[in-house]
C-alpha cells in the first residue's frame, strides 16, 4: 500500500511541477523587474533548487535600470502587512457566531477575548512577522506560500517558514482552493532532516560517514484526502516525506489542519497560481527599463564614439589605445585626411520624460502606491491626503477579501490546532456542545469603525430634529455601549453589560422621580432648577 501511495504521489508531484514550469518565463520577467534581488529564476529553473546554481552573494539586479516597480512592490507589501497583520498588535478578534443565544453572547465574547490574548501571546513570540512579509512579496507577483510547523516546546509552539517560489508547487481541488502542496528539499543535510522530521526513516541506499556531511534530496508532500471525513470538514490532511531516488516513504503523519498555506491576491479562473498586481504592472516597467537601457547605450556612443582607422605605415589601428595626454604617431594622406575618424552617428534615441513619468504613474496606480505630495506643497491639503488614503483602502478591499479567505482562515485553524495539541487552548462549550470559533479580521474591524461613525451621524441627525432630550427615546440605549465596544474591538471586561446598564438607567430614573416628588412637596414649580442643578420634572 505504501509503494502504491508513493508512486501515486510522485506522479502528482511531477504533474504539478510541469504545470508550474509553464509559468517560468512569466515569473522570471516579473521578479526581474519587481524584486530584482529576489529573482532566482534567472539563475536556476523551477524544480532544480538549489542544485543547479548557488546564487548566494551574487549580484542578480545589475540589469535593472529603473526601480519604480521594485519600490512600488516594497511599498505595497509594507502597506498590506501593516494594514492586515501589523507587528505587536492584536489584528484579529475571536467572536461568537450567530448560533449563540443573545443572553449568552456577552459571556462567550469575554471568554473568546481571553482566547484572543492567548493566540497573540504566542504568535508575537514566534517568527511570524519575519516570515509573513517574505510571503506577501511572493503574493505581489503570484502566490505566497507559508508553512506553519509545530514548535518543540510549549513556550514556542509556532515555527513559520516561507517557501522559495521555485521549489514549491500546488494543486487546486474540487472546492477551488489548494488541496495539495509539494516542496522540494535538494542537498538537505541529513542531520538537519532528522531534526525537521523526528524518527525519519533512512533511505535504503544511504550510508552515513562521520568524516563527510551527508546531503539528501527529499520531497515534502501534503494533500487532502477527501474520502476521509473529519467532522463537518471535507477531508483529513495526509503529510508525507519521500526519498525520490529509492521511492522510500521516510515520514508520515495525518493532520486535522494544513501545515502549508497558499494564498493569492487575485487570479484568473481556471489557473492554479495567482496573477498579482506586480504582474499587471510589469508591461509598463519593462517599457521603462528598455527605454532607459537604450538611452544609456545611446549616451555611451555619444560620449565615447567608435572610430575608424587605417594603417598608413606609421599609425597602426590594431594596437593603439585612446588615452588622455597620449600622442598618436600618424602621417596625413595626400588629400589631408587623417587615418583615424569617428563613425558618423546613425541614430539618436530621446525618450521624453513626460512619457516615462506617465508609465511610472501607471505602475503606481496599479499597485495603489501613489506617492503623497510634498509636505510643503501649498496645493496639498489634509483632506486630499485622507481621501487618497481612503480611496487606496477601498480599491484594495477586494484583494483583502480573498486574502481573508485563503490566508487568515487556514492560519487561524492551524494555529489553534497546534495550541490545542500543546495543551495551551481550552475549547468553549455551551449547553454541552463545543462551539466553533469565528473571528473578525482587520477588514471587518475597519468596517465596524465605519458603522460606529455612521451611528454617531444618525444620533446627531435625530438630535438636530427632536432635541437632545428626546433623541434618547429613539434608541435602546443599553445596547449602544456594548455594540460600539464590539465594533471598535474594545476590551469587553471594562464595559458594563446590558443588565448592569438597565439597572443603572433605572436608578437614574428613580432618582429623577424622587427629586421631582420632593420638589413638588416643597412647592417648587415644575421645571425650576434645584440646588443640584437638576430641573424638576
Sequence positions of predicted segments:
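Generic signal for short, ordered secondary-structure residues
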Residues: 98-102, 126, 267, 341-342, ...
Amino acid at each position: 500500500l505504501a509503494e502504491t501511495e508513493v508512486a501515486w504521489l510522485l506522479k502528482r508531484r511531477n504533474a504539478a511541477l510541469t504545470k508550474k514550469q509553464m509559468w517560468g518565463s512569466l515569473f522570471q520577467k516579473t521578479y526581474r523587474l519587481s524584486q530584482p534581488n529576489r529573482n532566482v529564476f534567472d539563475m536556476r529553473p523551477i524544480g532544480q533548487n538549489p542544485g543547479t546554481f548557488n546564487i548566494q552573494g551574487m549580484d542578480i539586479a545589475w540589469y535593472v535600470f529603473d526601480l519604480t516597480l521594485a519600490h512600488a512592490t516594497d511599498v505595497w507589501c509594507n502597506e498590506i502587512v501593516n494594514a492586515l497583520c501589523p507587528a505587536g498588535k492584536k489584528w484579529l478578534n475571536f467572536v461568537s457566531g450567530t448560533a449563540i443565544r443573545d443572553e449568552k453572547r456577552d459571556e462567550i465574547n469575554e471568554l473568546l477575548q481571553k482566547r484572543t490574548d492567548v493566540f497573540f501571546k504566542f504568535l508575537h513570540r514566534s517568527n511570524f512577522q519575519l516570515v509573513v512579509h517574505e510571503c506577501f512579496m511572493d503574493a505581489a507577483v503570484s502566490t505566497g506560500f507559508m508553512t506553519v510547523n509545530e514548535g518543540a516546546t510549549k513556550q514556542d509552539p509556532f515555527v513559520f517558514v516561507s517557501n522559495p517560489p521555485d521549489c514549491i508547487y500546488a494543486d487546486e481541488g474540487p472546492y477551488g482552493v489548494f488541496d495539495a502542496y509539494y516542496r522540494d528539499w535538494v542537498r538537505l543535510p541529513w542531520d538537519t532532516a532528522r531534526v525537521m522530521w523526528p524518527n525519519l526513516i533512512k533511505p535504503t541506499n544511504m550510508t552515513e560517514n562521520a568524516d563527510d556531511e551527508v546531503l539528501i534530496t527529499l520531497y515534502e508532500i501534503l494533500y487532502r484526502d477527501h474520502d476521509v471525513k473529519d467532522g463537518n470538514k471535507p477531508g483529513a490532511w495526509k503529510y508525507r516525506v519521500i526519498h525520490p531516488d529509492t521511492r522510500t516513504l521516510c515520514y508520515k503523519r495525518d493532520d486535522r489542519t494544513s501545515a502549508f498555506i497558499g494564498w493569492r491576491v487575485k487570479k484568473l479562473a481556471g489557473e492554479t497560481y495567482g496573477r498579482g498586481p506586480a504582474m499587471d504592472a510589469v508591461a509598463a516597467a519593462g517599457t521603462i527599463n528598455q527605454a532607459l537601457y537604450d538611452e544609456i547605450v545611446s549616451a555611451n556612443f555619444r560620449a565615447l564614439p567608435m572610430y575608424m582607422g587605417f594603417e598608413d605605415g606609421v599609425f597602426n589601428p590594431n594596437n593603439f589605445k585612446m588615452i588622455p595626454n597620449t600622442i598618436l604617431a600618424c602621417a596625413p594622406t595626400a588629400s589631408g585626411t587623417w587615418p583615424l575618424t569617428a563613425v558618423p552617428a546613425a541614430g539618436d534615441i530621446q525618450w521624453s520624460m513626460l512619457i516615462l513619468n506617465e508609465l511610472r504613474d501607471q505602475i503606481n496606480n496599479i499597485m495603489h502606491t501613489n506617492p503623497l505630495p510634498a509636505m510643503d506643497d501649498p496645493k496639498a491639503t489634509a483632506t486630499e491626503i485622507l481621501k487618497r488614503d481612503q480611496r487606496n483602502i477601498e480599491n484594495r478591499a477586494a484583494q483583502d477579501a480573498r486574502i481573508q479567505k485563503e490566508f487568515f482562515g487556514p492560519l487561524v485553524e492551524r494555529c489553534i490546532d497546534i495550541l490545542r495539541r500543546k495543551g495551551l487552548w481550552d475549547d468553549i462549550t455551551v449547553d454541552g456542545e463545543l462551539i466553533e470559533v469565528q473571528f473578525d479580521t482587520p477588514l471587518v474591524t475597519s468596517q465596524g469603525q465605519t458603522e460606529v461613525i455612521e451611528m454617531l451621524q444618525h444620533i446627531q441627525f435625530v438630535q438636530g430634529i427632536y432635541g437632545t432630550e428626546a433623541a434618547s427615546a429613539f434608541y435602546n440605549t443599553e445596547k449602544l455601549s456594548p455594540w460600539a465596544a464590539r465594533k471598535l474591538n474594545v476590551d469587553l471586561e471594562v464595559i458594563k453589560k446590558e443588565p448592569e446598564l438597565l439597572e443603572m438607567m433605572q436608578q437614574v430614573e428613580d432618582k429623577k422621580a424622587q427629586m421631582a416628588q420632593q420638589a413638588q412637596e416643597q412647592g417648587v414649580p415644575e421645571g425650576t432648577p434645584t440646588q443640584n442643578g437638576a430641573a424638576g420634572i
